Amino acid sequence: MSSKPRTRSSKKPTLIIYGATSYTARQLLAYLDTHPDSVSFDFILAGRNQQKLEQANNKLSQSREVVACQLDDPDGVRSLVAKGDIVVNLAGDECAKTGKHYVDLCGESSWLATDIIPRYNNLAIQSKACIVPSCGFDSIPSDLTLYLAHKTLQARHPVLTISASQSFFKMKGGSMSGGTIQSMYSVAELPKDKRRSGEHDCIPKDGILPKTRSTILKLSYIMKIPNKARRYGSFFFMYPYNRTIVRRTQYLTNLFSGSNSGLASDSGSSTPKYGKEMKYEESMDIGRGKIGSSIFSFCLFFVFGLFYASKLIRKLCTYILPKAGEGVSDEQLFKASYAVTNLSTSTPLPDGRTVQISTTFKGQGDPGYLNTCYLLAESALALTLDKDKLPIPASKGGLLTPSIAMGDVLVDRLRKSGKFEISSEILGEDSDKKID
């Protein structure tokens, strides 16, 4: 490991950005460099190539500490992790050992289910480190919309939970990132006994949640919001992964609600309680109606089927699809946006009626490249700068989800960033029902 020190206040909380020379990291560094809270924290650029790290550092408004470190160098990784308060995008094992928080953009349930949760969850609990994967477009919008739907519902009806929930994703521009495509390659190359695609793969079989079958993937989906036109959606390619994070949140709320500490924090905020049984679906609204959505889904199933079944097809795709580290133009990055609409239905009231909650989550910028950097950065800053406001589960540590580890703190940071519009309301009831 080689390090080139810069002027850095040791008193400030410090983020370690590993992989700081990647395409996505370029957007992340620019966001952190000009962040309104930048006087309150420092960050270190880390990666494998000293020269490229220096080049990335030269583009910042002020010089930062640069550390070149190989991941197969345990002493180097240990020394690097010791320099900061939170690691962004690497070294989850060393963080779990030393009690340092960690966030990343993981989108591989197989990796979480077979390698990370079994090996590091208990270790992180012992050290009180928050290990929080999937802090980007995969899967914060999915996790937080359902979290807010529960918060909105239980602010009016504390004993109710959500029995069914669906989210529609609407993209304006945007592209599939090279990192996401690389994750697909990684999963496809795994031995069959290590592949995971079930929505309950990231929760233990300890009886806290009942055994349920995974939701069947469909060609088309329909969303019926009262007094609005019906919306039809197609299969959303990140749904199989996003649902594993949603299910882990569901599991953790039930786990913590049964503990002595509960779910309320000292700051007065609390994590909502999820029910033990809940149907969850996601879809992509392509604006083509039921038939068009069904055809699009069929094409996706066919293409993905070929991709995962044939090494030859995957080899050909390497010449067509973006590679990790590749991206689109800055103009395309900033023009793109997305909107997530979640419609959730409660368990029955005593009179048999149910309550519906509508939650929206809108983000600026290409979801796979630019917006995901905003989400990742604010997640890291929430764990670093707002420790006293975090939910109780964050003080316990472990392999957590964004809503469990950060909850309202993350929602507030996203709103204040100016890059997101987030709201949630109960439908069909009187005032005092909206969270925004």
Language-model segments: residues:
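C-terminal catalytic/substrate-binding lobe primarily of soluble NAD(P)-dependent oxidoreductases
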Residues: 6, 25, 128, 140, ...
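A generic structural motif
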Residues: 36-44, 412, 418-420
